[in-house]
Structure formats: structure tokens, C-alpha cells
């Protein structure tokens, strides 16, 4: 930064009045509800999202041996991000491997990793490559395509299959509609309840950056969105800060896949 100017709120009286300034600076029940994730040091608390402390806890949990089903969570993009985990089938999960895959070789590399790890269930992002997921589903019978929705209910996800919900399905085959905010909230809660671990050697700066990138922002009632003591917080929504959150999404898909092994009769093996 070569040049800069210091601007105070009172320098723009036609944009923000003194009364509004007082409201916005004092009318927050939680100071972390006054959000600016792009400039300066952010006011954060435990409700704002995952922190490096949470990552350390996940590493400690990951030291405990875990056997069970293998599940995949895949986030698509020019560079695809894959999380491989062991699921106990009873609510616990440990991340054992992570991979980055060039989209140009995704199909061959994914099939190779399936032969190595033999996942019971795979949940993959569908955007922006829905045709890729459809093609992969022809070869991989336990691959579910994930679609984010913004629902008002408490249900984190719902499986839609062609036979039962043909009019609601975007894919012709297996699809999982994920209630985005609710699912990320539950993922964070499970991490803090020591249900999700990171095995030795999995954690690095990239994973830490991705898991701590997104933060929760409160949607609430009140004057111009200010959260006062009398206002009621309706819900949180997860927002990007720097945009490096791909492994966080892959972990969520893996978390959903682990729940599919608990509630559905999915045969082992990927092919």
C-alpha cells in the first residue's frame, strides 16, 4: 500500500448520522455481530466459526484409533479437493487423507483412489460440473451428488432418488440436498464435541486455512441489522472471507457421507 487516508465515521455526516453511529457501535449484544471480515482485526468469538484451537482439538481426537466405513467428500473446481475419512457408523469420524486433484484427470484419479480406499459412500459437489457428476455416477454406484439449498427447517440434508422424488431431482440418479447453514453448524458442533478428528500427518497450513476461512454472520431483526439486547437472532449464515474454503466443503460432504452409512444400506466398495 503506497498511500492511504484515515477516515473517521463523523467525516460523512450525510451518510451516517450521530444517532446511527451510536447504535452501530453500542447496540450489539455480541460484539462479534458487528462484522467486517475484510479489513483490520476482526472481532471473533467461539460462535463465529472454526479456529486454530478447534484444529488442535481435532488433531488430539485423531490420535484415537478408529475403525469402520471409509467415506469420501469431494469439492469440485479447476482444482478438486478430496477428503477421505473413517466413519465409526455411530457419529464419529476421523480424516485419514486429503488430496488435491486437477480437474482434467479427475475421473481417472478418483477411480484410482477408490480402488485404494474402497469407500462405502461418496458425496460430491455438483457445481459447476453437474454433467461430470452424472457421468461418474454411471461408473460409481455409491456416488451422491450434493446440492446446497437454503432451507428454514432443522433437517441438515435429504436424499433424493429418481424413483421417489423424480420431480425434485436435478440429477437423474442419487442426489443429496444439503441445508447449507444448518449442515455447517452441525459440523462445527460435532468438531467441538470431539466427534471429528484429524489423523497424524493430515494437518498442514492449507487445511488450517481452509477450515478457518468461513465465518458465521448473524441474520437478525433490528434497525438496519443491528443486534440489540431486545432483538432475536434468527439464524446464522456462513460467509467466505478470503475464499480458500475448499477443504471445509469437502469435509462437510464427507460428514454427510458418514451419516449416509449410519442410516442407509449402502454396499461396500466403490465400483
What are these regions (language model features)?
Residues 1-71:
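ATPase catalytic-site recognition across NTP-hydrolyzing enzymes
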Residues 27, 31, 65-67, 78, ...:
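Active-site-proximal structural scaffolding
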Residues 36-41, 185, 189, 248-259:
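Short, hydrophobic/amphipathic alpha-helical patches that form generic packing surfaces
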Residues 41, 45, 49-51, 55-57, ...:
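Mg2+-dependent endonuclease catalytic cores in nucleic-acid-processing enzymes, primarily RNase H-like
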Residues 62-91, 250:
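Gly/Thr-rich phosphate-binding beta-strand-loop-beta motif of the actin/hexokinase/Hsp70
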Residues 231-233, 248, 253-271:
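Acidic two-metal-ion nuclease catalytic site recognized across multiple nuclease folds
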Residues 242-243, 256:
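Amphipathic alpha-helical/coiled-coil segments positioned at domain termini
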Amino acid at each position: 500500500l503506497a498511500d492511504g487516508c484515515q477516515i473517521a465515521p463523523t467525516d460523512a455526516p450525510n451518510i451516517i448520522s450521530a444517532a446511527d453511529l451510536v447504535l452501530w457501535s453500542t447496540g450489539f449484544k455480541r460484539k462479534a455481530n458487528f462484522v467486517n471480515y475484510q479489513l483490520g482485526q476482526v472481532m471473533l468469538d467461539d460462535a463465529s466459526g472454526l479456529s486454530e484451537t478447534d484444529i488442535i482439538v481435532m488433531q488430539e481426537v485423531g490420535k484415537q484409533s478408529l475403525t469402520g466405513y471409509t467415506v469420501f467428500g469431494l469439492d469440485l473446481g479447476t482444482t478438486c479437493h478430496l477428503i477421505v475419512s473413517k466413519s465409526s457408523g455411530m457419529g464419529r469420524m476421523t480424516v485419514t487423507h486429503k488430496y488435491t486433484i486437477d480437474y482434467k484427470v479427475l475421473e481417472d484419479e478418483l477411480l484410482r483412489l477408490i480402488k485404494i480406499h474402497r469407500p462405502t459412500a461418496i458425496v460430491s459437489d455438483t457445481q459447476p460440473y453437474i454433467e461430470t457428476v452424472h457421468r461418474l455416477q454411471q461408473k460409481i454406484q455409491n456416488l451422491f451428488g450434493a446440492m446446497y439449498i437454503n432451507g428454514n427447517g432443522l433437517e441438515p440434508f435429504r436424499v433424493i432418488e429418481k424413483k421417489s422424488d423424480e420431480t425434485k431431482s436435478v440429477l437423474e440418479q442419487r442426489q443429496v440436498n444439503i441445508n447449507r447453514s444448518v449442515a455447517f453448524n452441525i459440523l462445527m458442533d460435532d468438531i467441538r464435541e470431539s466427534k471429528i478428528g484429524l489423523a497424524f500427518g493430515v494437518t498442514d497450513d492449507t487445511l488450517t486455512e481452509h477450515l478457518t476461512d468461513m465465518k458465521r454472520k448473524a441474520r437478525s431483526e433490528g434497525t438496519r441489522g443491528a443486534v440489540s439486547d431486545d432483538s432475536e437472532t434468527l439464524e446464522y449464515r456462513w460467509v467466505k472471507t478470503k475464499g480458500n474454503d475448499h477443504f471445509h466443503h469437502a469435509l462437510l460432504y464427507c460428514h454427510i457421507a458418514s451419516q449416509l452409512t449410519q442410516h442407509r444400506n449402502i454396499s461396500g466398495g466403490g465400483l
